[in-house]
């Protein structure tokens, strides 16, 4: 076979989601990756989800993606983060058994309809008249209409450990230099980023009696709406800390760290700093927490989350043995930093297609993100849009009001200067785009696109029907303050009757109290009552937020034609014109985010567009 509609390069989290999404829409897809064992690889921490990240997993699942469902087949320690705060910022997270995850992903991808897997290296991309036509594998052309690059850290990757430098995409695997050259030759701006990983420890050499236990949630909350119950055995994690002796060893050897010797030029992740960064940036802290995370039920490998490092191996040995519980530990693999090329994501459309090269899409770390979840979110969007383009359909765009995926892509296309990680704080509309309502927000859109399985559609529609029925019922149940008092519950004596729905959201009430007042609610699914509780809690705020969303939508609908000649707008300065030509914003809102583009320049563009297009096509979606 040497002809496909879509070719996906790379079999990590972005690549698997991209390939599966395009295949679900019904086009012919090839996924090209080096080795079978690369499918679904988790090269860094053995965990999925977290604050903001867990929201993306739920959103990918709502679009019938893979990451959540596969994680539920491999999750060994579930924990809902931020549970003491409001439901909008709860972060579902799970430790993952690497072997189980890879096995489940391999089985899924290898048996996916419309998807062919090729184990090889892509040497080059063929572009004719600024459109992709093929990829080059083993000197031969594989023809295609669309290419999705999901190369992770493999673009000109270099591993650093002390003064040691190894050309690799990750430890033990060759980097890709040809594709970096190809992207440069296509005129794309590349940058350099860095990430890191800690040493791995043999669990049999740890003194657990000195450590703090960290149990998971008593009842695991699955990521996927398809998962009825998590069946994988659950285990504990453990916590220890660095100390002043640890910090002393690190400080004395900072000159040997690849990060601090000037050897690494790439920018590292602000929110996942190396242990060297931590003791310098947070020198006032006497210690730093380390989470000891098992890599699997049948694995002796422990991932010490919190001490990624690029120090030499001997320094890592000395450092780690100063930590309580790890005094006699055996290191299985040493930590390292990895530096790699990424493409400035301002060169992408919101569909993740490269503006200057038709049919070329980018997803994952190649766009400057960090994390499996961010990669999966981009992968599924790139896959959907590549397939829609093959079918000559409009792109599928999620904006900031729709999803965290929309927030991420909007942030990326407006430009980044460090590895991008998702947090709930990045969203202005987080009350509306919660993890618990991801399917209600996105699954109907996915059904319309045709990228949802029959099973997913049936599960969703059944749940939605039950939820709507229950919502109508609890809104029909009313009770006066006097009646509540007779039931033993105090509320403001203003004579206004409350519905059971409104009671669910009151601070001193909740499901159990409302069930006590209305025992007939005991026959309904408790999970559905929980969803209505969240709706009730945020009801007033959501009504207010609707106005903000309407304003956002108005601004977002002002499209800027790609062929607009900015030289025809006389009031724009030379600097503003140059920046607008460079970044080619698709909307007025995107233009506002370009550094140096002034409010007066924005107004000049709007006036020009209204005059030129007579108030019509500038509000038409492309």
UniProtKB/Swiss-Prot annotation:
Keyword tRNA processing included in the entry's annotation: yes
Where along the sequence do coiled-coil regions lie?
Answer: none
Q: Which residues hold FAD? A: 10-15, 122, 176, 365
**Keyword annotations from UniProtKB, A to Z:** Cytoplasm, FAD, Flavoprotein, NAD, tRNA processing
One GO BP annotation is: tRNA methylation
> Which positions bind NAD(+)?
268-282
* Superkingdom of this protein's organism: Bacteria
This chain's protein is named tRNA uridine 5-carboxymethylaminomethyl modification enzyme MnmG
Q: Which organism is it from?
A: Orientia tsutsugamushi (strain Boryong) (Rickettsia tsutsugamushi)
Task: Outline what the protein does.
Answer: NAD-binding protein involved in the addition of a carboxymethylaminomethyl (cmnm) group at the wobble position (U34) of certain tRNAs, forming tRNA-cmnm(5)s(2)U34.
The gene name on file is mnmG
